[in-house]
Amino acid sequence: MDHSSSKLVSQARLDSEANWLFWGSFIALVATAFGFIVRTQVINEWGIQFNLSETQKGELFGVGLWPFALSIVLFSLVVDRVGYGKAMVFAFGCHTASAIITILAQGYWGLYIGTFIVALGNGTVEAVVNPVVATMFPKDKTKWLNILHAGWPGGLVLGGMLALMMGSVDWRLKVALIFLPTAVYGLMLFGRRFPVQERVQAGVPYKVMLQEAGILGVLIVVALIVSEVGRVFSWPLFLQLSLGSVLVVGYTVYVRAWGRMMFFFLLLLMIPLATTELGTDSWITALMAPEMSQLGIHSGWVLVYTSLIMMILRFFSGPFVHKLSPLGLLAVSSLVAAVGLVALSKSTGVMILLAATLYGFGKTFFWPTMLGVVAEQFPKGGALTLNAIAAVGTLSVGVVGAAFLGYVQDRTIDQELRLKDPVLYTRILAQEKVSVFGKYRPLDQDKLELISLAKQRIVEEIQAGAKKDALMVVAILPITMLGGYSILILYFRGRGGYQAAQLLDQTTKG
């Protein structure tokens, strides 16, 4: 075999390996979505069976998210040394163990632990696939990250349809659906050779990666992690502040850099972005249940429908990115999402499907395009900056977003029921509870079952109004994002337009 033939064979092998890695990563994201969508389908069954309040259900959504951020940050710090393949073995173990624990759960804490473990696996998957794909496609990162993240809505569609078609079967069988994509990505990725991350290839030192994120970036991540873990384990505020201070001061002493201000700004924007997309996704089934039931359609189909829109559009993201630029695409998406959420909160009947379509278009490009902007602007940050933006987004939903939506509903139900029927209010409200947002009194599910059908209808009407209020509140967030992206667009326009930063090989210098 001559040299040219040998080179062609070698390239073919590389292309084949890249295909297996990319689509294996895609299926791994499908697995993360399966766990999420099934939770939205069975959360109301959990509420009835285990007498959960709306805020407790919100906390279960939250614990499906914040440990994700914990694992994605920790693996980002060590994954280049540990190895991407070993990290995926850990993710596989988490997905398998979490399903078993959840299926065997006997109450709130069993569900909580099972959901916590699946979130660790999900974070590990993202810690691996984002830098791997950014490295494989260095000249078109935003496009390929969008295609990769079509796996998320794709998993929502497939997992959601399977769960809905299973009908009223035991929720444990629906939870077991995650075994399907987990087995597939395990077979596709185990034993594969992962590429060396572009920062490492270019010889950019580990400390420089930490300096790109900087003190300000780590301050946000640490504050969100410590506040949520402190809430879960009932740590006093003094302990939370002390632990957070030790972590941030230790990081400061080592890196001695504030970090990139644009990265800090993008971290702040990621908080409303993630709450708009994931926070609303978490509740979309329950939020739209009253209206969809009047049409004779299970509300879970709304999330499946909007996810189908996302999946299709992400596969064809290239023209949108090239026409509008990543920041332009994010600005337009923010406006469309805001209009869609307002429409969802006001629409009734068939019009709700049109509103859901608008919302689906709006949220489609948020997450992967934000990752693309970070990958293109901060390549020296390697796996850390790329995954820290995802961590902050996920933490903000786990700590703030999902629990906040539940709190809005519980507080609205409390206030409206007290005004409409004070006697009923005293009969069916549970003891006062405390969340991160303050005190509230949830409905007692056991007492609710004992009242008359007429009284139950009163409660259902109030609950429906509370769900609409939650959607209207979320609509404020993409408006905030639109302002932020407009500022960045003007900044780049003053510098000649948006351009991806080029990573020079540090090993060839001086």
Predicted regions and their residues:
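Extracytoplasmic gate region of multi-pass secondary transporters
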Residues: R39-Q41, G214-S242, Y251-V304, G398-V408
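Glycine-rich segments within core transmembrane alpha-helices of 12-TM secondary carriers
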Residues: D140-A163, L386-Q409
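Low-complexity, proline/glycine-enriched hydrophobic segments characteristic of transmembrane helices
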Residues: F404-A475, G510
